[in-house]
Swiss-Prot record:
This is Cytosolic Fe-S cluster assembly factor NBP35. PROSITE patterns: MRP (PS01215). ATP binds at residues 86-93. Belongs to the Mrp/NBP35 ATP-binding proteins family. NUBP1/NBP35 subfamily. Signal peptide: none annotated. [4Fe-4S] cluster 2 binds at residues 259, 262. Its main location: cytoplasm. GO terms for molecular function: 4 iron, 4 sulfur cluster binding; ATP binding; ATP-dependent FeS chaperone activity; metal ion binding. Binds 4 [4Fe-4S] clusters per heterotetramer. Contains two stable clusters in the N-termini of NBP35 and two labile, bridging clusters between subunits of the NBP35-CFD1 heterotetramer. Transmembrane segments: none annotated. It is found in: Cytoplasm. Residues 1-45 are annotated as: Disordered. GO terms for biological process: iron-sulfur cluster assembly.
Length: 342
């Protein structure tokens, strides 16, 4: 008989309380056990004589006491938007950085970026603040300002050496994300973009739980045209629906390569099943646009420079602005006010 996986925990239970750690029991749960994570754990009549009684009775119960503090801290943030992808390497962090810079081209807007890709933080590099550190005051942590109206928070600012690996399990990641939300002086922001790691992991569950009371506006999902990427994006969309996260739209990244010399468009990654636009129609979600592959965008990220300042007329720049305008429309804002024409 081959190896088998344990019966997975119902997804509804995980989403309802992903941060509560199940107590380490010393004996199997008896027949009439109320459940080691229930409010009656260790105190119900059926717990009498159980070897696990003391363990269950001392385990933390009830809602997270820090949630009201998070809600209060983020009271001045108007729109909280997650950026998700089912697969790594599709340009999710790149898109997050470009969305932030596009929104920040409006001098009337104040934008924040929270990097929750704990094990692979790349946002500081892309926004040109990799060498900065966090300043702590009596009222909390100060974010790093990449521009007068663009604030950034990432674990990268806390590393002694920029090449240090972060080898953490879920609880420690959850704790840092909570600190980013509860202890950082975000102040008044028009937009807070949350860059996440690929897939559906502890970081996603934590952010969703911590922001539940202060309301997430929704999520932007990033893909590339090929089916191997779309396959994982379908799972990401399913996660959002089960978690109650509104999908603001799908962005197809690296859709075409437009030659900067002759402007001829070449399909590098073939959309064998119709690409992002077809998937959006299939899943019933908005399609925000397709961003062409432009090596100059990668170069701008490497140097931490604004792609919008360096190549304002490039097809990728124009496409990114259209994505942001489409996103603005989804959250009830005037697209032309969010990213002015020209």
């Amino acid at each position: 008989m081959g190896p088998s996986l344990e019966t997975p925990e119902p997804v509804e239970d995980v989403l309802a309380n992903p941060l509560k750690q199940k107590p380490q029991l010393v004996a199997p749960e008896p027949e009439h056990c109320p459940g080691p994570e229930s409010e009656q754990a260790g105190t119900a009549d059926s717990c009498a004589g159980c070897p696990n009684q003391a363990i269950c009775a001392s385990a933390p119960k009830g809602p997270d006491p820090d949630l009201p503090a998070i809600t209060a801290r983020l009271a001045g943030v108007k729109h909280k938007i997650l950026v998700l992808s089912g697969k790594g390497g599709v340009g999710k962090s790149t898109l997050t950085a470009q969305l932030a810079q596009a929104l920040a081209t409006n001098p009337e807007a104040t934008v924040g970026v929270m990097d929750t890709d704990i094990c692979g933080p790349s946002i500081p590099k892309m926004l040109g603040v990799e060498a900065e550190t966090i300043h702590v005051s009596g009222s909390g942590w100060s974010p790093v300002w990449a521009a007068d109206n663009l604030a950034v928070m990432s674990i990268q600012f806390m590393l002694p050496n920029r090449d240090d690996a972060i080898i953490w399990r879920g609880p420690k990641k959850n704790g840092l994300i909570k600190q980013f939300l509860k202890d950082v002086e975000w102040g008044d922001l028009d937009f807070l973009l949350v860059d996440t790691p690929p897939g559906t992991s502890d970081e996603h569950l934590s952010v969703n739980t911590f922001l539940k009371e202060s309301r997430i506006e929704g999520a932007v999902v990033v893909t590339t045209p090929q089916e191997v990427s779309l396959l994982d994006v379908r799972k990401e969309i399913d996660f959002c629906r089960k978690a109650g996260i509104r999908i603001l739209g799908l962005v197809e990244n690296m859709s075409l390569f437009v030659c900067p010399k002759c402007t001829h468009a070449t399909e590098i990654f073939q959309a064998t099943t119709g690409g992002g636009r077809a998937l959006a129609a299939e899943m019933g979600i908005p399609f925000l646009g397709a961003v062409p592959l432009d090596p100059r965008l990668g170069m701008a990220c490497d140097y931490g420079e604004s792609f919008f300042d360096s190549f304002p007329d490039s097809p990728a720049c124009l496409a990114l602005k259209q994505v942001v305008r489409g996103l603005a429309g989804q959250i009830g804002l005037d697209p032309k006010e969010v990213v002015p024409e020209g």
